[in-house]
């Protein structure tokens, strides 16, 4: 592309970073960086009643955690600021263009009460008409309309400002993702509000003013914004401005239910911060989210953010709904943890501290031992770092209960023979025995007693760890304190084999 690329991610600070919003931010970032453009963050905080205290901070922190950077934002202002809509409104930026539309007759003040609007909707439903706003100044001159304004103001009524929708107009654009789209003016529901009674601009008006003044060239956003686009094009045309290129990305749906992701669906984690707290890796989150509605060439599925940037092609954005597959996310995260376990190790150790398996001071002193424990336990079987806690809890920090099934293994004829042989040979081994030494000892017991398989391994594991499954036993034994293991064996022997 030869034109100057300027794209934006414009969240509302009404909540934390949702997976869908993260995808919007990631694709806009990729588009900007691939074409050496500018990535802008603008905060759309006009809905003060719904804004939460740390909404903006959370959004920016989680974007940074994902590895995204930006060129302009509230915390990195450029020449097109302010970058919060509330601040832009205070400066009168929107009012200037509201006044221009009022002066040209393309907008007007409406004083209808909520009761009047409800009555109109009921009448339209009774007449089986599509819901639409009924223009109240039909046939009046400008002077007569102004007189009506004064009359309503005298009654203490506060107006909203509505845009006068051209009735027969068709709004068309060539969507970057969906191709050619046409929507008739009649489909937008009649004259719509561009300024609320409290003086705040509505979303579809403010976003146009901001995108124009910030010189946004491309607008990449979710499919649910398609219905907003004709309203926005109306404002561009009414003010004589060039319309940016729009691209509407496919909806993200729940892979199990097939329904659009809903923030009210508590059965599926949908916020980046939730995955961060569980120990998902930022590279994995970007990797997974980047494949929701975009497909690379070839069969590979594991990509870094920089690799995405190099191969990004907006033409490969999909029209089909993107399935949020929790199992796929777990697999992707596991791939990233296995790719560089040493890099994830501090986080894995911290999980053990957080779970109170070990104190922070002891963790610092035993860092090498903990690293070996985690490597023996293996990250292959976990989807995120918090799961390491249960993987290593037994037998490295706690002993589980011996079940009836385990007792049967121990007290069988073969079990008693194996337990006795294992206790005596283990005690004779040096404290610095290697995995090979332990394996050789177990093989010798197998050959001497002619017992193998579960009848061999289960009694040994039960005597040593109170478990019948777990990490590689010879490797694990090198990490367990010998005196502790001997005490465990003697306790088992006294309780079940005496």
UniProtKB/Swiss-Prot annotation:
<feature type="short sequence motif" description="'KMSKS' region">
    <location>
        <begin position="260"/>
        <end position="264"/>
    </location>
</feature>
<feature type="short sequence motif" description="'HIGH' region">
    <location>
        <begin position="11"/>
        <end position="21"/>
    </location>
</feature>
<keyword id="KW-0067">ATP-binding</keyword>
<dbReference type="GO" id="GO:0008270">
    <property type="term" value="F:zinc ion binding"/>
</dbReference>
<dbReference type="InterPro" id="IPR001412">
    <property type="entry name" value="aa-tRNA-synth_I_CS"/>
</dbReference>
<dbReference type="GO" id="GO:0004818">
    <property type="term" value="F:glutamate-tRNA ligase activity"/>
</dbReference>
<dbReference type="InterPro" id="IPR004527">
    <property type="entry name" value="Glu-tRNA-ligase_bac/mito"/>
</dbReference>
<dbReference type="InterPro" id="IPR020058">
    <property type="entry name" value="Glu/Gln-tRNA-synth_Ib_cat-dom"/>
</dbReference>
<comment type="similarity">
    <text>Belongs to the class-I aminoacyl-tRNA synthetase family. Glutamate--tRNA ligase type 1 subfamily.</text>
</comment>
<keyword id="KW-0030">Aminoacyl-tRNA synthetase</keyword>
<dbReference type="InterPro" id="IPR033910">
    <property type="entry name" value="GluRS_core"/>
</dbReference>
<keyword id="KW-0436">Ligase</keyword>
<dbReference type="InterPro" id="IPR014729">
    <property type="entry name" value="Rossmann-like_a/b/a_fold"/>
</dbReference>
<dbReference type="InterPro" id="IPR049940">
    <property type="entry name" value="GluQ/Sye"/>
</dbReference>
<comment type="subunit">
    <text>Monomer.</text>
</comment>
<dbReference type="GO" id="GO:0005829">
    <property type="term" value="C:cytosol"/>
</dbReference>
<protein>
    <recommendedName>
        <fullName>Glutamate--tRNA ligase</fullName>
        <ecNumber>6.1.1.17</ecNumber>
    </recommendedName>
</protein>
<dbReference type="Pfam" id="PF19269">
    <property type="entry name" value="Anticodon_2"/>
</dbReference>
<dbReference type="InterPro" id="IPR020751">
    <property type="entry name" value="aa-tRNA-synth_I_codon-bd_sub2"/>
</dbReference>
<dbReference type="InterPro" id="IPR000924">
    <property type="entry name" value="Glu/Gln-tRNA-synth"/>
</dbReference>
<dbReference type="InterPro" id="IPR045462">
    <property type="entry name" value="aa-tRNA-synth_I_cd-bd"/>
</dbReference>
<dbReference type="Pfam" id="PF00749">
    <property type="entry name" value="tRNA-synt_1c"/>
</dbReference>
<dbReference type="GO" id="GO:0006424">
    <property type="term" value="P:glutamyl-tRNA aminoacylation"/>
</dbReference>
<dbReference type="GO" id="GO:0005524">
    <property type="term" value="F:ATP binding"/>
</dbReference>
<feature type="binding site">
    <location>
        <position position="263"/>
    </location>
    <ligand>
        <name>ATP</name>
    </ligand>
</feature>
<keyword id="KW-0963">Cytoplasm</keyword>
<dbReference type="GO" id="GO:0000049">
    <property type="term" value="F:tRNA binding"/>
</dbReference>
<keyword id="KW-0547">Nucleotide-binding</keyword>
<comment type="function">
    <text>Catalyzes the attachment of glutamate to tRNA(Glu) in a two-step reaction: glutamate is first activated by ATP to form Glu-AMP and then transferred to the acceptor end of tRNA(Glu).</text>
</comment>
<dbReference type="InterPro" id="IPR008925">
    <property type="entry name" value="aa_tRNA-synth_I_cd-bd_sf"/>
</dbReference>
<keyword id="KW-0648">Protein biosynthesis</keyword>
């Amino acid at each position: 592309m030869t034109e100057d690329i300027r794209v934006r991610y414009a969240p509302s600070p009404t909540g934390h970073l949702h997976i869908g919003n993260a995808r919007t931010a990631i694709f806009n970032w990729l588009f900007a960086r691939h074409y050496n453009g500018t990535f802008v963050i603008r905060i759309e905080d006009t809905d003060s009643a719904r804004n939460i205290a740390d909404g903006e901070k959370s959004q920016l922190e989680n974007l940074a955690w994902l590895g995204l950077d930006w060129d302009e934002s509230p915390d990195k202002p450029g020449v097109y600021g302010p970058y919060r809509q509330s601040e832009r409104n205070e400066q009168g930026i929107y009012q200037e263009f509201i006044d221009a539309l009022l002066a040209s007759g393309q907008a007007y003040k409406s004083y209808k009460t909520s009761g009047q609007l409800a009555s109109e909707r009921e009448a339209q439903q009774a007449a089986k008409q599509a819901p639409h706003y009924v223009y109240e100044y039909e046939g009046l001159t400008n002077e007569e309309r102004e007189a009506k304004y004064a009359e309503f103001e005298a009654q203490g009524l506060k107006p909203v400002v509505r845009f006068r929708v051209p009735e027969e107009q068709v709004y068309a654009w060539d969507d970057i993702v969906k191709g050619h789209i046409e929507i008739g003016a009649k489909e937008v529901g009649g004259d719509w509000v561009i300024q609320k009674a409290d003086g705040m601009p509505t979303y579809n008006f403010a976003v146009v003013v901001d995108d124009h003044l910030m010189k946004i060239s491309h607008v990449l956003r979710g499919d649910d914004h398609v219905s907003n686009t004709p309203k926005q094009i109306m404002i561009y045309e009414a003010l004589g401005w060039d319309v940016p290129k729009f691209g509407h990305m496919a909806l993200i749906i729940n892979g199990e239910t097939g329904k659009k992701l809903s923030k009210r669906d508590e059965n599926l984690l949908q916020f980046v911060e939730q995955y961060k707290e569980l120990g998902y890796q930022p590279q994995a989150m970007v990797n997974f989210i980047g494949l929701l509605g975009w497909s690379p060439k070839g069969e590979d599925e594991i990509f870094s953010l920089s690799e995405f940037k190099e191969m990004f092609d907006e033409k490969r954005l999909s029209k089909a709904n993107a399935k949020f597959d929790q199992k796929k996310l777990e697999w992707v995260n596991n791939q990233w943890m296995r790719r560089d376990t040493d890099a994830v190790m501090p986080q894995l150790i911290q999980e053990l501290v957080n779970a109170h398996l070990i104190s922070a001071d002891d963790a610092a002193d035993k860092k090498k031992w903990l690293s070996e424990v985690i490597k023996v336990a293996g990250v292959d079987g976990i989807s995120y770092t918090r799961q390491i806690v249960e993987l290593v809890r037994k037998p490295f920090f706690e002993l589980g209960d011996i079940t009836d099934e385990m007792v049967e293994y121990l007290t069988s004829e073969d079990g008693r023979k194996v337990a006795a042989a294992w206790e005596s040979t283990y005690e004779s081994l040096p404290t610095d025995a290697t995995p090979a030494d332990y394996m050789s000892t177990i093989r010798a017991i197998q050959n001497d007693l002619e017992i193998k398989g579960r009848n061999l391994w289960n009694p040994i594991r039960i005597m040593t760890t109170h478990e019948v499954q777990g990490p590689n036993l010879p490797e694990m034994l090198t990490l367990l304190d010998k005196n502790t293991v001997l005490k465990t064996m003697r306790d088992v022997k006294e309780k079940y084999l005496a």
